[in-house]
Amino acid sequence: MLSFTKSAVSINGENGIFMLTNNTRTLVKCLCAMMVLAFANGSNSVRASQQDWVQLAVHNFGAPINTMWDEGELTFADDGTMVYCSARADLDAAPGDPKDLYIATFNEKTGSWNEPVNMGEPVNAPPATDVDPLRKGDDREPWITGDGQTIYFKSDRTATTTPRNNNDLFVTHLVNGVWTTPELLPAPISTDAGNEHCPMLLQDGESLCFASARAGGYGQSDIWCAQQDANGTWQNPINQGPNINTAANEFHFTQDTDGVVYFTSNRPGGFGAMDLYSSKQLGPNSWTPAVNLGSQVNTESADMCPALPPGGGTLTWFSNRSDSSFGAFDIFWTNKTNLTSTP
């Protein structure tokens, strides 16, 4: 895994820099080439407007992260390593594979992202439609632990037509530099009827939260959380209640060190097809009423699956907004200070 204190990333063709201290408590982004030009040749007003643009803009991650295919559903380890989902066909682990998991790291020497690497088998499952037509090799929605040693994700590798079970949750571990064969998170986590997806751990490191359409919820897809007992057995998941869940769809929790969770919902009153919301944890399974993050990140399109890079100062997500200039869905970032509403 990559370890660094300062590295750069190309963002939509512009040179943007990530500066992380050793404990990754700060994350600073700037557009160096444009900023240098402004300070060298521009007036104070030009410099101020340039700084404003950098701070206020929503930025496309650019190549090689975004491609002509769909990218999204990203997650970060503490060292900045990113795991995300892509439909790109050029690096498929197997022909005809619809969605695979990729790992991307920063290259300090080139000042850009390294070419993403397909995680390959056994993490990414090849299509097995000859076994069941639902087994398309769809591996998505990863969540990596801060130490970079464990990834939870959703897969259709065990999907069955009868009973209909499209997706289950799996976990893989990095052992001696090799990712282990993913293990199914059994019932009561994965179920036949729930179509579980978007797993993650809260900051306590013990509460596994995920989305499920199982019975007993408020709507279509709700967010549930569960813990293991002393013997490692998963306890019955607890619905996170009406301050999080509605009669619509809620999914994809991610939590910062202040206890604030960010997630996706298509509840009424939003800006578009899917919006990003936030809520602050009050205690176990208790949250403040969710608030919409506002028009800086939410558009009339679908804005989904928030993630928090190291340092806590920025928010990333994926969207099919009109300026998705690489593919139908691209990955974007902005400064958290631009969010209209937070708990």
Please place each PLM-identified region on the residue numbering.
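Short, conserved micro-motifs composed of acidic
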Residues: 46-343
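Accessible peptide chain termini
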Residues: 1-2, 343
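Bacterial N-terminal signal peptides that target proteins for export
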Residues: 8-31
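Bacterial N-terminal signal peptides
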Residues: 30-41
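Secreted/luminal cysteine- and crosslink-motif detector
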Residues: 4, 31-33, 210
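Serine residues within intrinsically disordered or low-complexity segments
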Residues: 3, 7-10, 43
